[in-house]
Amino acid sequence: MQRRGAGLGWPRQQQQQPPPLAVGPRAAAMVPSGGVPQGLGGRSACALLLLCYLNVVPSLGRQTSLTTSVIPKAEQSVAYKDFIYFTVFEGNVRNVSEVSVEYLCSQPCVVNLEAVVSSEFRSSIPVYKKRWKNEKHLHTSRTQIVHVKFPSIMVYRDDYFIRHSISVSAVIVRAWITHKYSGRDWNVKWEENLLHAVAKNYTLLQTIPPFERPFKDHQVCLEWNMGYIWNLRANRIPQCPLENDVVALLGFPYASSGENTGIVKKFPRFRNRELEATRRQRMDYPVFTVSLWLYLLHYCKANLCGILYFVDSNEMYGTPSVFLTEEGYLHIQMHLVKGEDLAVKTKFIIPLKEWFRLDISFNGGQIVVTTSIGQDLKSYHNQTISFREDFHYNDTAGYFIIGGSRYVAGIEGFFGPLKYYRLRSLHPAQIFNPLLEKQLAEQIKLYYERCAEVQEIVSVYASAAKHGGERQEACHLHNSYLDLQRRYGRPSMCRAFPWEKELKDKHPSLFQALLEMDLLTVPRNQNESVSEIGGKIFEKAVKRLSSIDGLHQISSIVPFLTDSSCCGYHKASYYLAVFYETGLNVPRDQLQGMLYSLVGGQGSERLSSMNLGYKHYQGIDNYPLDWELSYAYYSNIATKTPLDQHTLQGDQAYVETIRLKDDEILKVQTKEDGDVFMWLKHEATRGNAAAQQRLAQMLFWGQQGVAKNPEAAIEWYAKGALETEDPALIYDYAIVLFKGQGVKKNRRLALELMKKAASKGLHQAVNGLGWYYHKFKKNYAKAAKYWLKAEEMGNPDASYNLGVLHLDGIFPGVPGRNQTLAGEYFHKAAQGGHMEGTLWCSLYYITGNLETFPRDPEKAVVWAKHVAEKNGYLGHVIRKGLNAYLEGSWHEALLYYVLAAETGIEVSQTNLAHICEERPDLARRYLGVNCVWRYYNFSVFQIDAPSFAYLKMGDLYYYGHQNQSQDLELSVQMYAQAALDGDSQGFFNLALLIEEGTIIPHHILDFLEIDSTLHSNNISILQELYERCWSHSNEESFSPCSLAWLYLHLRLLWGAILHSALIYFLGTFLLSILIAWTVQYFQSVSASDPPPRPSQASPDTATSTASPAVTPAADASDQDQPTVTNNPEPRG
């Protein structure tokens, strides 16, 4: 192998343009102010450029570094052949590298030496240049030492002055000789000079990673604060997180109902620069793979149904977009570089009611579509499609949608695991995407197989009932006796079925329900008959549940609910899901609970969808935490809620926040025959406008325990509008006339009434006028005028309507659509409680396509959940539970509050926990969960959790509850949250914990805005807590907080007294005086008493007291003292 020689070449300079990320200010910013050519920057090598250099350059570099001549010098001088080679004394890049250049010129020449480097996004950047002439020493080998100086950012680590040292991939030192006889100018360009080289050579220097380099001695003294800050981070080595191109878009089954809602996912840019550079380079040559599991129930009922598609920042379909057609084919659409769209349809149809995996690989213009059936991935179909067009692909400039959206409906079925390989085109054998939740997936398949049998049985029964009913009507058309029999007699039933005993034994509850069903009530439309029969089975089951001992019958009712669910009546599916998830008088079974929740969600059952949305929002009951998946379920119900509210039919009621612990609110609940309702009716009849309005609202929306009765409500609206001249009643009646809700439309009268109400200053009526001109007259200028006026008056509907004008691009004087301004109006409307405005805001938060609404999936879920929980069907369940509670029907109250609480609405969760506290025997007997703990715990994780729920959980953590152990730390957190919400009991409980010796952590004090530096001991903290407790107490008289505060200060005062030096001195002084006085007193008493005399016996002692003789004075004084001391009576 030749190790040294003249004329060796090097790889041709790369002409590939650098990735666009390095072009511009960012690349220039990494160049130091002096000594470095412009354009050198970055930290890691460009992958493609580095591969080219390492394959070619290093091998030649190793051959020429530190080389010796193979040809003797004498022979070289005789040959007079130009050559050049050099020796680098240090193989690493240093600040000053010494290079020995040996060369020979046969003619006058110029010797050129250059150092070029390659960084992350740049190649062949010169950092050192030197040239010199040789005109005299010809035909002689000469040596010159050159000190090559490299920029500091290539040699040293980051420090206070070198802020961005660069990572260099290759450093090449090259030299060449050119002759001067051609007459070229000395100042000719280096690149042009290089082309005329007669001898050239190069070597490759070894680079040092940035964090292995030494620090540079700048010989500058930093200020102490700057030096201290720098020393804190001087030795920190940043680490890039492990990142790859695989994205798991979905890991848990998603029940797609075939409606205009779906899962929204957004890809971020890669944090790894090399991956990001690769992604950018492939924008016009997409290389990626999609792998997803599907279980289809039906093919698309429209032209196209969404499976997985990309929506760009302009709200247009991008690459890729995969849809399902009516016939069962796949429709795959791509966006071209030239701006057009291109689509292709597969040659095969995908299977129904089978779990299968769909793999789609893109590799430039080639698409490979593969379907595999079952968990063993049995091959089903494979198709390769090739195109000559260039596809445009930018997976970060928009968002992906799984299922439906406002642009297209989704499929009817279930999505399984979905993986996306962003930078790789893989063969199906290379894809790792197993069917997760295998048991659940198998249960879904078994459910629909069983339900196919049930639906066939019901369909045949409905057909037989239809023909039997027709024969009876034809034979007995005018028989009055039979009419009476049909009306008052026992219903006619079908006694014989064309099924075998084996099938009857397999579905006993179904055949029992069909045998007991009235033939004449079966619908004639066979397509609707299965669902309606399921509804009748459900109604009979619910009637049994509503009895006195309804919960006791659940186990026998479950089979009937199962049959009802199979018939497509998915209220039964939700009941079953709740029964299994809570263990409501059935063995608790999480798998079955998930199954029926998903089945109900797929059937678009409102409570089931809310249940799924809540479980994924909180990540509870073995459901994974997934806000995008939660949003898909909540948004489905939220979009239906405004429509449901304007639907007069259906079991709906207004969702009211009524707490069972609030006796005052419970007292005003009424019914049509209740005292409150009768009093309102009496006042309304007398012409009281407020009573008429309230009565109409209660009847129209079904509020305060009154059943929904739109017809009666409209009568009161009309009476109030025409008699009392109340603007609110006039407006309400005008809206009813405009929409024809329960009354014949009368646009003319409605407009007159609307103008009349607006003239009275009602902002709703001003907004109504704008709505009239927008909807009926298409006069957008007048509509905007009224809406702007109503918005100034504080009407949220007007804000929403103005947003619609900007969104549609029809706002007068403003050309084109303005989504940013529309979003601002929608946000203002949402803050005023407008449902549609809230929905638009949640959509903006989940997509992140507007700068004013940065992507925030959690906030999107919260806003969609807020609207969904106003749904009237949920309100109906809550109202039934409340009515049962007021009537003392504990079984029914527990049932309906469990059903409502599992949807995630806070008021029902706290009410259910309250019922379980009132009737713990009922909860223990029928529920398979710790009712009090579960639902108070759920409630404290709500956005608008009440303070008493925090107090309850604090007590449960403090005392421990059933199987839950005591946890003082969590108890402190719960009390602190209650205190932060302004509840005085929270402050009081925290103070009691401190009295017991519990230490409140500093972060809790900071949370309560108690400065730990000002309150450094427990006494000062207690004072602050009791003072806040007193200030937040709403009791006018003495409260426990005020008494506790007073007691604390008395203790402090007494403690201060006992520990005072003055008190000790005074006490000692007084005690000394008392002792001295006592001693002096006893001394004086003892001095006044005479010495005792010996007693003399007298024979007549017994009679001496009765003697009339007067005793001498001395004797009298001697006898007087013992008489006084022994006499218990006062002297006379």
Curated annotation (Swiss-Prot):
Keyword Glycoprotein: yes
Pfam families xref list: Sel1 (PF08238)
Region annotation (Disordered) ranges: 1-24, 1087-1132
Keyword check for Transferase: no
Primary subcellular site in the record, as a coarse category: membrane
Domain of life, per lineage: Eukaryota
Glycosylation sites: 201, 382, 527, 937
Ranges of compositional bias, category Low complexity: 1097-1116
Alphabetic keyword roster: Glycoprotein, Membrane, Phosphoprotein, Repeat, Transmembrane, Transmembrane helix
Transmembrane feature ranges: 1057-1077
Modified residues (Phosphoserine): 608
Subcellular location: Membrane
Polar residues composition-biased segments: 1119-1132
Sel1-like repeat boundaries on the chain: 575-609, 611-647, 694-730, 732-767, 768-800, 801-839, 840-877, 952-988
The protein's name in its UniProt record: Protein sel-1 homolog 3
GO CC term, one of those recorded: membrane
Membrane topology, record value: Single-pass membrane protein
